[in-house]
Amino acid sequence: MAANRGSRTFLSVFLLCCWQGAELQPIKTTSGPITEGSLNSTTENIPEALDEILAQEILEPKTSAVSETSPRPRSSILTTVQTKEINAGIDENYQEEAFENYHEVLENIEHLPTKEESGKNDRSTVANLHDHSSQTKHEPPSSPEGKGSSNDDVYGKLSVLDKILENIGQSEGSLELTESIF
């Protein structure tokens, strides 16, 4: 779609450059009966007429008949402004916090006994991981500065991660975890 938009933009700029000094010629109309000869000449003039309409639309977009009858498309600037407004409420440190949380989980997994050492199946390993992560959770401190909500988000993300790991363990069934996964 972006390529299509780019080609339309290129075509518009190209036509503006070519027809900047050109004068529009009136469209020739015939009156009287339509004969095969006049029909052939009419079909030959269609590309010229379309070119003239396109040139008129480009040179005078507010006064052409096409722009008066068709709705104007939204401007890309408006879309960009709306996107910036939507993204204004997003925490910019979100990716950094998620990266740190991921490494914390990996460290917790490394501290758990491996399957060869413990001789347990993957359900018990996931249960140990869930127990370990639930034991290490602390209640977020409430502060008058409003930082409690960001801590709530962090702990919420960790609890979601715990649920995902628990679901993975349940869906795996009797499959064994290998160290290559971690």
UniProtKB/Swiss-Prot annotation:
Residues 112-154 are annotated as: Disordered. It holds the Pfam family SPACA7. It comes from the Eukaryota. InterPro entries: SPACA7. Involved in fertilization. Seems not to play a direct role in sperm-egg binding or gamete fusion. Its main location: secreted. Residues 112-140 have a biased composition (Basic and acidic residues). One of its GO terms (cellular component) is acrosomal lumen. GO terms for biological process: cell adhesion; negative regulation of cell adhesion; single fertilization. This is Sperm acrosome-associated protein 7. Testis-specific. Expressed in zygotene and pachytene spermatocytes, round spermatids, elongating spermatids and spermatozoa (at protein level). Testis-specific. Glycans are attached at residue 40. Disulfide bonds: none annotated. Keywords: Cytoplasmic vesicle, Fertilization, Glycoprotein, Secreted, Signal. Residues 1-24 form the signal peptide. The lineage of its organism: Eukaryota, Metazoa, Chordata, Craniata, Vertebrata. It is found in: Secreted; Cytoplasmic vesicle, Secretory vesicle, Acrosome lumen.
